[in-house]
From Swiss-Prot:
Cross-referenced Gene3D superfamilies: Phosphorylase Kinase, domain 1, Ribonuclease Inhibitor, Transferase(Phosphotransferase) domain 1
Expression across tissues: Expressed in roots, leaves, shoots and spikelets.
Swiss-Prot/TrEMBL keywords: ATP-binding, Cell membrane, Glycoprotein, Kinase, Leucine-rich repeat, Membrane, Nucleotide-binding, Receptor, Repeat, Serine/threonine-protein kinase, Signal, Transferase, Transmembrane, Transmembrane helix
Pfam families in UniProt: LRR_1, LRR_14, LRR_8, LRRNT_2, Pkinase
Name of the protein described by the UniProt record: Leucine-rich repeat receptor protein kinase MSL1
Lineage: Eukaryota, Viridiplantae, Streptophyta, Embryophyta, Tracheophyta
GO molecular function ontology, one term from the record: protein serine/threonine kinase activity
Entry-linked CDD domains: STKc_IRAK
Protein kinase domain location: 1107-1401
Amino acid sequence: MAPMLSIASRSPSPALIAPHASARATGLRAPFAGNRIVGWGWGDQTKSGTDRNRASICVVLFLRVRSGEPTQAPRDPPAAVGGGGCYVRLPAPPRDRDAVLYHVCLFTLLLCFIPITALAESDIKNLFALRKAIAVGKGFLHNWFELETPPCNWSGISCVGLTVVAIDLSSTPLYVDFPSQIIAFQSLVRLNVSGCGFSGELPEAMVNLQHLQHLDLSDNQLGGPLPASLFDLKMLKVMVLDNNMFSGQLSPAIAHLQQLTVLSISTNSFSGGLPPELGSLKNLEYLDIHTNAFSGSIPASFSNLSRLLYLDANNNNLTGSIFPGIRALVNLVKLDLSSNGLVGAIPKELCQLKNLQSLILSDNELTGSIPEEIGNLKQLEVLNLLKCNLMDTVPLSIGNLEILEGLYISFNSFSGELPASVGELRNLRQLMAKSAGFTGSIPKELGNCKKLTTLVLSGNNFTGTIPEELADLVAVVLFDVEGNRLSGHIPDWIQNWSNVSSISLAQNMFDGPLPGLPLHLVSFSAESNRLSGSIPAKICQGTFLQILRLNDNNLTGSIDETFKGCKNLTELSLLDNHLHGEIPEYLALLPLVSLDLSHNNFTGMIPDRLWESSTILDISLSDNQLTGMITESIGKLLSLQSLSIDRNYLQGPLPRSIGALRNLTALSLSGNMLSEDIPIQLFNCRNLVTLDLSCNNLTGHIPKAISHLTKLNTLVLSRNRLSGAIPSELCVAFSRESHSELEYVQHIGLIDLSRNRLTGHIPRAINNCSILVELHLQDNLLSGTIPVELAELRNITTIDLSSNALVGPVLPWPVPLASLQGLLLSNNRLSGSIPSGIGNILPQITMLDLSGNALTGTLPLDLLCKESLNHLDVSDNNISGQIPFSCHEDKESPIPLIFFNASSNHFSGSLDESISNFTKLTYLDLHNNSLTGRLPSAIARVTSLYYLDLSSNDFSGTIPCGICGMFGLTFANFSGNRDGGTFTLADCAAEEGGVCAANRVDRKMPDHPFHVLEATICCIATAIVIVLVVILVVYLRRRRKMLRRRQFVLVPAGDNAMADHETTLSNNLLGRRRMKKREPPSINLATFEHAPVRVTVDEIMRATGNFDGMHVVGDGGFGTVYRAELPGGRRVAVKRLHGVGRRFQGGEREFRAEMETVGKVRHPNLVPLLGYCAAGDERFLVYEYMEHGSLEDRLRGGGGAALGWPERLTICGGAARGLAFLHHGFVPHVIHRDVKSSNVLLGEGLQPRVSDFGLARIISACETHVSTVLAGTLGYIPPEYALAMRCTAKGDVYSFGVVMLELLTGRPPTWSSAEVTAEGDDERGGGGSLVGWVRWMAARGRGGEVFDACLPVSGAEREQMARVLDVARDCTADEPWRRPTMAEVARRVGAIEAMEYGPLVVAVSSGEPPAMP
């Protein structure tokens, strides 16, 4: 056998090993200098034919010492030496004169191969070891497991000679611990394993990679502190560790990496201060540390980084000021310090960085103004100062930024006008100045910015008209001036904007007629203005119009022909106008999804053709003058999901064909004249969630088939003529089993059968209504006892059984009913005494009405002092004993009782000074009892009283003087007491000696006569007193009016008594006329846990710094949110609504009614409304303050790294349940209308809570109204309404789908063309929207690449992500009917949260590492 030379193999790269025919073997020539490689081949030696895993690959080289024809390669490879290996076959030794030369060459060959042999053999073994360690990636590393592929030809492996110099396994989903075999390749120069899903910690043996220059470990799950050995790799030039879970402090040893040009460690959990040693890296060009937990100030040593081009430190906890030494970074191109805690002014030195192209300082605690020197940054393309607490005026020098493309200055507190110099920004494409504090007029110079595509000036105080010069902005796509004070006509020239797709002019003071609209307009919103006249037909001259919102104006005329040309119209919202005529039939031919004609003057019958529409999902025709019957044709509208025709004049029976509407979820026909029995076919609509047929003339029994409506959670049949017994089958729909898909902590279930003629007993099966929250059976003919089974309803908050014929005890159950807040049992035949332990049985009781029964005994001690009780009525009973006003001495908190009526009983004894402890009492009625003694002066210290009736008792003595100073008191009656005296407050004022003389009940006139002089003096004195009294009264009345303007009561929504206290009072205390006794105002406190909190406007002003921008924490579609700390230390969020005083003009009760409804919403995934205020034109809402900010902040500006997949999935599930509760669980159902990540707030433990639903359009039950409607947010708007807001539940579903995609991808809902250029071509797909981009990627088979690279996921978690992505894509379907309901979304996400992990089903490829400068 010819001599063999063993060669350790490192897989040659394709460039070094050529096919046999080409004879390229240049990489192997060096060891054979002066010789010629004449051929090569591959051998495969195994111990058996089936043992393929132990195959070894050999290189066969055929050489010839002398020049000449190459030796022929053998037909078969020789047997391997030693059971395998690689070899070189040499020709046999010559027999002639070349023998000496032959042996010399052979010796030289051996010397050259000896060092390479050992190294190559080691690398080959390491490659096979590495392959074994990552065998899970066999499906992605195909040629690693192909026998015919040399190791150096394996994908991602690069060799020089036979030595491995580069490993690139990026975007290969392996999901194993970091393979230690990698560190065995000692000649490695480049290592890229980004996006491999590696976990664990880096080994200290990293020090072995002494030749490493490029290290990319991004997009994995690696954690722990960085090993100290990493900083000994002194040849390292690029280190990329983004999107991992590394923690600990950044070691000062980083100063050893003096060759470093790129350091990118973003989106980890590094903490502590930035080491000053970073400033010693003189070659550093790219530094990215964003989204970590670095704290402290920016080291001054950073000024040494003179070569730095890119510095991104956003989303950390950096404090201090922006260091002045930053001026030394003369080559800086991008600076991003956003979302930190930086303070102080923007340093002027920053404006010396002449190469700066992008400056992002948003979301910091900066102060001062934008420096005048900002105009020196001539290369600036992006200036983002959003939410920086900046004040003063915007400098004129802003106009010097000639190539600026994006200017973002929203959510600041600028003063004055937007400078005219902004018109010099001829390259400006986006101007975002929302809620920035600007006043004055919109600068006409903006018309020079002809490249503008986005102009957002909403939420300011701009006045005047829209400048004519803006007509030149023909490139504009989005124009938003909502929520200002703009006036005048909407200009006609807007129809010349050929590229605009969305125009929002809502909530201004525009008047006059509607103009024509641009041809390519998709969305037009002009609600809440003063537009008048008829709607012109030319409004439909464009063929792209999909959404038209003109509600809350003064539009008149009919719509007989108006919208015939709107061939793509999907939403038409005309509510709250003065339109008349009949509803036209052509509406059925339009692709409408939502039609809202409520609150107009439409007459006639509902056209039958409307029921033939193939697209419509929601119809609202409430509050018109429609007549006739609902015909059987309604059964043709199979797609219908919601129908509301409340408060019209419809007659006749409900059509039987309504049972064909199997998709119907909400049916509300209250306030009509419908008659006859409820058709049994109605109960075929098995998706019904809300059924409201109240306020009609329906007769007959409640059908037992109601049990078929298993999804029902709202049933309102009140104010009809229904008779018979309450069917026990009713509770099938309200059982936990029927609603198991929505695991609400607080369920919502409403049964309202009040004001009918129902008889019999309350069914004992009521305990099966386990999701029931409110039960209203008042005003019927029910008999028997209160069923003890009510105590099993653990979620019940309100029970109203008043005005029936119930007998027996008040509380038949001894166990606590912790959730019950309102119990109304008045006007029955209940007997016995009030249990002494009632406070323990009803621990959360807020309203207790036991009046009009036959109760005896005494009032339990401490009942009046119970911390939760606001309203107590025990009038018209036979209760005796003393009224227990005295509380325990250790009670320090204010007594929350607001309303107390104990009249017409047998109470005795006297009132003592302890009544002064009831500082919140507004209504006190104790008339017709046997109370004795003197009236305590302490009663005058209950300054909140406005109704006081102590008549028909046995009081004696005087009326306390202090009562005359109770300016809030509007009714007081002391008549019918001892000695027959009849005294009113007018008597108090008219008594001798001034306002408060000793006016005893038994007082008699003096006997002695007056002398003439004395009489004269007395008359003069009396006249002076009268004049002074008149002056005092005028002063006090004016002061009182001022106080009314300045003071309000923070009312837990639902508290009508307190709301009535806010209304203007018609009588003053000094008795200009005597008020007649009136019924106490109705109140509803039953759904609130806390007593009202009294604050004044002044206190709110102080708490918000006079609504200073520094207190702004956000801005919603209808107002600005301020952080405030009330007296007593409670932190709240105060939402100051924009321009809604006019909206509720003449209807404060309407505003209150809406807030009453919203205030009842309580769910752990919703931000609760604590109170509200209507003071003049101001409207304030007070919410619980959420310390941890919003989901948007966490994902893009405040800690996204802290949100791993488990946290994101929990947020997704919780938010879904909150929205599902609004859609399906609360009555009246609430459509959010502005679902977005900034409206998902994070509470303790990152518990998600959906906010801003309090301003959503409310679809109410019997006594509802139509309320304000929020505008949606760009990027979250469903396609059927283009860039505007939706008013259907399916619109909320679409928006929530976008939020789900944000959670999955970490991307914003939209991005600009400038951002696309920065990111790369992949970002162009989808047209700049997140939904479009996900579809674009999926269509190209790259769906697995959409996930956020920073998500720390395992294989099982990746499957969860894939399933959530499926749900999100269903939610964002173009067709609304293809989208699931929120109930279904919550169920599916809940199932994903609880899923058992199966095999990995989705392969994920992360994106490329960040581009290096």
